[in-house]
Amino acid sequence: MKQKVAGKFKDHLGELPPLSKPKNKDFGHFAVPIFKYAKMNKQNPQEFAAALCDALGNCEEFEKVEAVSGFVNITLSDSFLNEFANKVLSEKENFAKGSGKERILLEYISANPTGPLHIGHARGAVFGDAIARIGRHIGYDVVTEYYVNDAGRQITLLGLSVYLAAREILGLDVKWPEEYYRGEYIKDLAAEAIKEFGEDYFKAEIDAENFNDDKLNMWAKDKMLNLIKEDIKALNVTPFDNWVSEKELYKHWDEVRAILEKNGALYEKDGKVWLKSSEYKDEKDRVVVREDGRPTYLAGDIIYHWDKFKRNYDRYINIWGADHHGYIARVKAAIKFLGFDPEKLEILLSQMVKLLKGGEPYKMSKRAGNFILVSDVVKDVGADALRFVFLTKKADTHLEFDVDELNRQDSSNPAYYINYAHARIKSIFRNKEMNLEDTVNIQLKDLSKDEKDLVFLALQFPYVLEEAFINREPHRLTNYLYELASEFHSFYNKNKVIGSEKEEVRLKILAVVASIIKLGLSLLGIEAKERM
């Protein structure tokens, strides 16, 4: 719609002008700034605006074109709004769909496979999934990826924890080290390991400091990944396209190190190998190889980003926990030293989540020890409610909410309020024994201001999607759907629909609103309720 409106100005201005929405709805649907174009044409701004209004006044797409304080304001015609309303109703879930845009590799969650997902992981998971859904819908080729940290000490520690828990189940002596994974899930895993490997496998006493049973480690890691995949499914996160193993990538370390050395990125000091990351905005240089010759965690990330950039996407997006903020500069420095463009990498941060229940801190999971598990909260409030609340704010801001509020069945609960708008409209159509698309042949005409405002707001949907994706802010879509639901409830409470003289026109407007709400919620990974 915006492109078509802007296109009407192109012949007169020489380019597609920027369109904005007037703050006051009485000033129309769109506004075009005039001063720049008057100056380019060496004309008085008022005279230039008046001439432009005269030239565009006969366009069938515009009901009114007028000059106001340096802007040309446009009010769209009923027939133009009807044209786009028909697109909504006929294209259904394909409305606002695009194609042929950038190829993007989006990596998110990438939680260590040492336990089930906790609530902090869930926010990043929902954030990433919403970005992927919206991006794909509007035409970006978004490939999603989960980086499996299966090469570090944490995997050895997982295997050790399972081994010792198995010995404890078998009634054997156990000396627990200071650091290990605890919780019911480790005990469950240990019981399963006894069945898998047999009791004799766990009878040997081991030195916890030097334990490294790769067979048990990998078995436990795979079990944890399956658990994580169950949590991802429970959150209604779209299955990942790629699962990339850190352990497999380490086979390329010598090759990657050779590239870094050739490009002058490394030096030795104090028996360690350092990356010259301070040359690229990092506060200091970073160790990539320890004194004992083992690569650091950073080395693994360098290999991974080398592998990513070799795949030649147009853009790379990583979603990290906010505690990784200090890590950004060193990774971008490594990318630069590898000969790639670090500006192609965007790193988005997902902040902490604080959960309450009845005003009190949400209870930690007995199953995981000191974490709140995704699976527990999903059982408590459902995936849709949890996804919605995660998408009400920018991901890089702190989020605190009470799960009891998510179960409230009134207008104070935004998720309920939006769904109620959809269900309310669907109920009207069920009573009329009509489908939404049955209204496509009804002509929108003689629209009142309330009617015009509501249908115009619904038709802002494609623009909202673009802004939500380009800015990596899916909460813009959430806020828009809440605004649309509010406008609908206000309209419906003030205007009679069934039995009114304008029943058909109003049914069509409601059909458009319901269609947009359903599609919008689906792009947030939420199912619109048909009945409430």
Swiss-Prot record:
GO terms of molecular function: arginine-tRNA ligase activity; ATP binding
Pfam families tied to this protein: Arg_tRNA_synt_N, DALR_1, tRNA-synt_1d
Organism encoding this protein: Nautilia profundicola (strain ATCC BAA-1463 / DSM 18972 / AmH)
One GO cellular component term: cytoplasm
Enzyme class: ligase
UniProt protein name: Arginine--tRNA ligase
Subunit field text: Monomer.
SUPFAM superfamilies per record: Anticodon-binding domain of a subclass of class I aminoacyl-tRNA synthetases (SSF47323), Arginyl-tRNA synthetase (ArgRS), N-terminal 'additional' domain (SSF55190), Nucleotidylyl transferase (SSF52374)
EC id: 6.1.1.19
NCBIfam families noted in UniProt: argS
Primary location group: cytoplasm
